[in-house]
């Protein structure tokens, strides 16, 4: 039985509104406070309440002066205790006065105008990308407009490098343009965190470069700043099912040069409908061959993702005014060129009715309209990187109201994720939120006007809008609607941690509790720090406190451990000072406070215990009530059969409501698959696969390790490219005179064969080669570095080094022990902020369980 909506709405404000009160939010988890301090705190703000107060005032400032305080108080109430968590850019930027930033998490851009495939157009789009990244926004676009590899270019008399090669320009620029430097400031003027650009690129299944696109990230280091998705049409999926042929094709540039210049915009169906000619590049006897290639890449490497583009456009509320071919980086917003993703989430842990073992619908009815108004105001309050994006925001007024804490809330109610009861509750919840949000938007239209592109007849005829309750549709017909789209299930990596560590978005609880380990650059006051440590003899002294340390063994390593300030502290020879704390999901804390926690109960199942069907059925149920899209990762075990994996994607397509699918198969992020010059275009060579080394930039981040091997003290320098070991140098400590406290720096390549070290503490060493004791040492580091650059398995390198004998033994062991620390980190995903391997992949985004860094917010 679906829950009926009513017309109850927040009361009309009086002309004399009361002063705005301060919120009273409390962190119950130290991890949440750290995420606030590192990610959202602005300048000298005292706490989360000051941030929320500024956000509420700022978002209410677009209201009429006489009611601004009324709505500011409503927004304070909404934000208080994390009942509603705005998108990360709103929490971070609203109320700061920073005019170069935006409140919008992501933007979809793309080529426009005439001659879209020209170098001028490409450079124009790169300029747009730069402005989006500079403003802290994520970036998405479709590469369909780019001509295929090998196409003759008349103007230069040569061949085009193709769409995938050109993407390297976007990839490189994304690595350069970040918001933040990583340097500490003496004055607290702004934020504490570097925000790196997130990107999504899409390419259609008909494009002649699609095979190269599918295999692009199987080459180590290639297009690492992109998420990649293939646009799959209904026609292609039917060809796969019915074993029909499939042709890769592109406009006939020579046969319709003027039409190509004026009318080619990447929409092949539109091009062909106008009668313009195309060129067939390759025909697969069966479309399933190409589908199999895509599925194998996704199975083995988790990329590219798959987007069902016809489903996206058929269910688009603005089907009559726009065409969609791209998404934001995490896929929860399917958008046209110029589109923006304005995000916010209802925290379901604050809307549970424990007595009824159900959702608190009356409380939801109160707060959903306030959340819709809050988000609608952002369209008027936020800056945008480019004028066309601001125009898009105000013409369409899209918002993306979502949920977080879904998995935690179910666990609070003792309902197993994916169970029949959970699905029934989810169906009722989805319908309720959808109808309440649309009615709230219609109320706003009555007060403030409908969005400018609203066409009543066409809008109400839309496939998604027809799913609304008759009363809701009648309300829209009478008053119009303020926002073209209202709903989106987004990644909430940082946001869910900020909200006292609830589960993210639609995901189940990843782990009920776990140990968080964080490298500490400085010791807190009162903690004694080990010094003069002899790891073999197990002797040390301490400075700075009275803490008592004890020796323990983890694996084959000796470590020191103590307890201080309700945490376990460790000290090891490669990572230095470490802090360990126990992190618990919000639902676990809730049950512990009631004395009802039972980790063995069926309702306490986490992501590790769930079946694939639990994920897919949950997605299918909620997708019926979401007008934009959902960012949700289907986690599958390492031994999940490939044929069942393919069937999973076909089943998702057949729902007709899920707009895309992303999966993560356990253990598959590691593989750096061998690629040759021809394998990137889909051809396979026999014999031993050869990989091309990733080019070395002039400067590499460097981690500095000090250790003892067979009685000799060594310093090992590991150069890192995108967080992975790229090169290594090792020399005796007494030749370097480098303090053991120095842990990080930069390896600078001055010229071929000459490398200099500049540490973060200001030490500088010129020409590292001069510090080797012998030619054998230099030769061995060269060979190890060569193997690393070509993607050799680190575990294999370590095993070979440990077999060394003779005079080189101590030197080889020192390098082996150092590289051993990187084995597990390479075999899993590593955090780009702290290099932790303690990572979860959910909702299409990576979240570090140690430092809280999230690729998506």
Question: How does the language model describe each region?
Answer:
Residues 473-475, 675-720:
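Short, Gly/Pro- and small/polar-rich lid/capping loops
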Residues 56-67, 78-155, 159, 163-169, ...:
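Function-dense linear segments that define catalytic or interfacial modules
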Residues 844-854:
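Cysteine-rich micro-motifs
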């Amino acid at each position: 039985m679906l829950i009926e909506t009513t017309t109850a709405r927040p009361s009309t404000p009086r002309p004399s509104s009361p002063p705005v009160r301060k919120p009273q939010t409390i962190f119950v988890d130290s991890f949440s406070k750290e995420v606030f301090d590192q990610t959202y705190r602005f300048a000298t703000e005292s706490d989360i309440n000051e941030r929320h107060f500024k956000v509420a005032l700022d978002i209410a400032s677009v209201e009429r002066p006489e009611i601004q305080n009324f709505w500011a108080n409503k927004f304070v109430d909404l934000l208080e205790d994390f009942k509603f968590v705005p998108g990360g850019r709103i929490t971070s930027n609203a109320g700061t006065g920073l005019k170069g930033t935006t409140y919008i998490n992501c933007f979809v851009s793309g080529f426009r105008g005439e001659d879209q495939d020209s170098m001028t157009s490409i450079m124009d789009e790169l300029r747009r990308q730069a402005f989006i990244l500079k403003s802290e926004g994520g970036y998405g676009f479709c590469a369909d407009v780019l001509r295929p590899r090998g196409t003759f270019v008349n103007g230069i008399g040569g061949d085009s490098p193709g769409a995938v090669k050109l993407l390297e320009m976007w990839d490189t620029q994304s690595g350069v343009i970040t918001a933040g430097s990583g340097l500490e400031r003496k004055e607290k003027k702004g934020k504490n965190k570097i925000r790196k650009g997130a990107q999504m690129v899409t390419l259609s299944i008909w494009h002649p470069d699609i095979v190269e696109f599918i295999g692009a990230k199987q080459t180590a280091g290639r297009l690492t700043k992109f998420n990649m998705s293939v646009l799959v049409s209904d026609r292609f999926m039917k060809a796969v099912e019915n074993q029909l042929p499939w042709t890769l094709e592109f406009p006939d540039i020579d046969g319709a040069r003027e039409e190509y210049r004026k009318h080619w915009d990447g929409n092949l169906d539109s091009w062909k409908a106008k009668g313009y000619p195309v060129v067939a590049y390759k025909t697969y006897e069966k479309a399933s061959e190409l589908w199999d290639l895509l599925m194998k890449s996704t199975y083995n490497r988790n990329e590219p993702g798959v987007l069902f583009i016809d489903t996206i456009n058929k269910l688009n509320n603005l089907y009559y005014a726009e065409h969609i071919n791209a998404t934001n980086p995490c896929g929860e917003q399917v958008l046209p060129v110029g589109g923006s993703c304005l995000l916010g989430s209802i925290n379901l842990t604050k809307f549970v009715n424990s007595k009824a073992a159900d959702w608190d619908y009356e409380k939801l009815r109160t707060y959903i309209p306030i959340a819709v108004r809050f988000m609608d105001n952002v369209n008027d309050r936020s800056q945008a990187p480019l004028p066309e994006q601001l125009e898009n925001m105000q013409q369409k007024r899209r918002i993306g109201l979502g949920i977080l804490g879904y998995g935690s809330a179910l666990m609070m109610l003792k309902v197993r994720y994916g169970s029949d009861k959970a699905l029934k509750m989810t169906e009722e919840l989805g319908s309720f939120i959808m109808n309440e949000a649309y009615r709230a938007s219609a109320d706003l239209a009555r007060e403030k006007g409908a969005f400018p592109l609203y066409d009543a007849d066409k809008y109400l005829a839309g496939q998604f809008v027809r799913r609304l309750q008759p009363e809701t549709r009648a309300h829209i017909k009478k008053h119009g609607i303020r926002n073209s789209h209202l709903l989106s299930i987004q990644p909430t990596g940082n946001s869910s941690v900020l909200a006292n560590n609830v589960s993210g978005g639609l995901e189940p609880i990843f782990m009920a509790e776990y140990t968080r380990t964080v490298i500490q650059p400085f010791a807190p006051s009162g903690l004694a720090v080990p010094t003069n440590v002899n790891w073999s003899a197990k002797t040390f002294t301490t400075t700075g406190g009275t803490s008592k340390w004890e020796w323990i063994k983890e694996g084959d390593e000796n470590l020191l451990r103590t307890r201080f300030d309700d945490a376990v502290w460790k000290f090891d020879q490669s990572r230095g000072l470490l802090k360990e704390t126990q992190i618990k999901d919000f639902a676990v804390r809730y049950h512990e406070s009631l004395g009802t926690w039972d980790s063995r109960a069926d309702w306490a199942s986490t992501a590790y215990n769930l079946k694939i069907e639990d994920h897919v059925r949950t997605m299918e149920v909620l997708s019926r009530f979401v007008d934009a899209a959902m960012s949700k990762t289907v986690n599958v075990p390492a031994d999940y059969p490939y044929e069942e994996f393919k069937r999973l994607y076909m089943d998702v397509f057949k729902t007709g409501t899920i707009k895309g699918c992303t999966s993560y198969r356990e253990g598959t992020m590691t593989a750096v698959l061998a690629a040759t010059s021809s394998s990137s275009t889909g051809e396979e060579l026999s014999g031993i696969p050869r990989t091309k080394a990733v080019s070395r930039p002039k400067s590499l981040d460097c981690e500095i390790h000090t250790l003892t091997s067979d009685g000799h003290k060594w310093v090992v320098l590991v150069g890192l490219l995108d967080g992975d070991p790229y090169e290594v140098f090792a020399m005796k400590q007494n030749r370097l005179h480098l303090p053991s406290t120095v842990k990080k720096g930069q390896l600078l390549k001055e010229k071929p064969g000459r490398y200099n070290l500049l540490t973060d503490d200001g030490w500088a060493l010129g020409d590292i080669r001069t510090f080797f004791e012998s030619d054998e040492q230099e030769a061995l580091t060269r060979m190890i570095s060569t193997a690393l650059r070509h993607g050799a398995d680190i575990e294999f390198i370590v095993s070979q080094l440990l077999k060394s004998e003779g005079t080189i033994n101590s030197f080889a062991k020192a390098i082996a022990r150092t590289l051993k620390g990187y084995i597990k980190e390479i075999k899993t995903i590593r955090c780009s902020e702290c290099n932790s391997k303690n990572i979860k992949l959910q909702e299409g985004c990576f979240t570090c369980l140690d430092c809280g860094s999230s690729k998506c917010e």
